[in-house]
Amino acid sequence: MCSCGKNRAGEGAPKRYSRNFTDPWRKTPGRVIGTSFVRFYQVTLSSLIGNSCRHLPTCSEYAYEAIARHGLWSGGWMGLFRVVRCGPFGTHGFDPVPRALSSDLKWYLPWRYWRCSAS
């Protein structure tokens, strides 16, 4: 029998695939609002602009995951700095969201998130 519709464990309902971060995350109001804005952009404006991102994951996927992992303030700054780097003279290639933030990052020094998201 074909096992295409089953998840890796081989049992249960088919696994749902998504282009965004699918791990469990705390759904605080800020995170829900931030990820909703990113998802709105993905559904509406992204298809009009076209595929022009130089990174993997794309900038909108990066922003979604950064907000889901680290909250609206930290993840929003990381997503903004990623979009700024995604230009003709910017970086390119594989650039994942850090799993944990450094302890020297302070909420009142948002420009330090540039260094965090560029690694």
Swiss-Prot record:
Membrane topology classification: Peripheral membrane protein
Source superkingdom: Bacteria
Pfam families with a match to the protein in the record: YidD
Transmembrane regions: none
A GO CC annotation given for this chain: plasma membrane
Subcellular location as annotated: Cell inner membrane
Keyword set includes Chaperone: no
Keyword Repeat attached: no
InterPro entries membership: Membr_insert_effic_factor_YidD
Keyword tags: Cell inner membrane, Cell membrane, Membrane
Function text: Could be involved in insertion of integral membrane proteins into the membrane.
Family of the protein in this entry: Belongs to the UPF0161 family.
Protein known as: Putative membrane protein insertion efficiency factor
Organism: Brucella anthropi (strain ATCC 49188 / DSM 6882 / CCUG 24695 / JCM 21032 / LMG 3331 / NBRC 15819 / NCTC 12168 / Alc 37)
